[in-house]
Amino acid sequence: HRNKFEKRGFDRVIDVWGADHHGHVHRLQSALDALGLDGSHRLEIVLMQLVRMMQGGEVVRMSKRTGKSLTLSDLLDEIPVDAARYFFNSRAAETQMEFDLDLAVKQDSDNPLYYCQYAHARICSLLRKMEEEGVTVPEQADLTVLSEEEELALVKQISLLPEEIIGAAADRDPSRLNKYAVALCAQFHRFYNACRIKEAEDEVRDARLVLCRAARQTIYNVLIMIGVEAPEHM
């Protein structure tokens, strides 16, 4: 840490530790204070609660003493990389996580990652089909024609992304992006089920297509920030 502050010019250092090391936080900050590096203010330590693995509704028992453990390599033999990244990012640091191995591989709406990736693929499919049927998906449209409750709610949800990014960074809580992604996809599905697109008048249809494009791009952006793929086909 001294090297980071003195030699490498860091203004602030953020360490991520397991909660079982909480007793060392004050010691390290005090040591940096003694070196004149203002560790109490410039060193921030985020304590992560431990993860409890679940499978078949039961806890997967692990023990350092007996040597029974589950490594990340072992985990990735059981579930996709995307699932590991999404689920590990789905809880705030101070919240204990129950990692459901069965849920992580489910391919239905119970799995939040599948739910979000499916929403992205669904919009991609919709836009492709419109183009195949001779309907040009416009870059811009008059969005003032959107007046349905589900349309306006989707517009509002899309607009919240910058605020969520800033909040996630300020709170050191990237799980906010997971929650936002699920809320956005849920709102898109409500919009899609309530508002006809192909059969609508041209002006309304174009506005709804632009809204779909905006939703797709926003879902894509969030999934990429979380570190998972945004598939166009599922």
Functional labels for PLM-detected ranges:
Residues 1-234:
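Non-catalytic interaction-recognition regions
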